[in-house]
UniProtKB/Swiss-Prot annotation:
The keyword Nucleotide-binding does not apply. Residues 52-61 have a biased composition (Polar residues). The keyword Transport applies. Residues 1-25 form the signal peptide. Forms a complex with PtlF. Component of the type IV secretion system ptl required for secretion of assembled pertussis toxin (PTX) through the outer membrane. This is Type IV secretion system protein PtlI. Keywords: Signal, Transport. It comes from Bordetella pertussis (strain Tohama I / ATCC BAA-589 / NCTC 13251). Residues 37-61 are annotated as: Disordered. Induction: Cotranscribed with ptxABCDE. Activated by the two-component regulatory system BvgS/BvgA.
Length: 61
């Protein structure tokens, strides 16, 4: 259980660290706290990474 809890904390930290960057790069007009203009959830980081690459063309692959 401790391992899962630490993973959740790490995931939350990563989201908090990545969200502002995604906000600035992808959704300058989007509301604060939502990295995607579509309002997609922040939690699935596995989907967030590939989507970030495809929707944010400001970052080089």
């Amino acid at each position: 259980m401790i391992h899962a809890h630490s993973n959740a904390r790490l995931l939350r930290w990563a989201i908090l660290a990545i969200a502002p960057v995604t906000l600035g790069a992808c959704a300058p007009n989007g509301p604060p706290g939502l990295p995607y203009p579509d309002g997609k959830p922040l939690i699935p980081i596995n989907t967030a990474a590939p989507e970030q690459g495809s929707s944010c063309q400001t970052r080089a692959p």
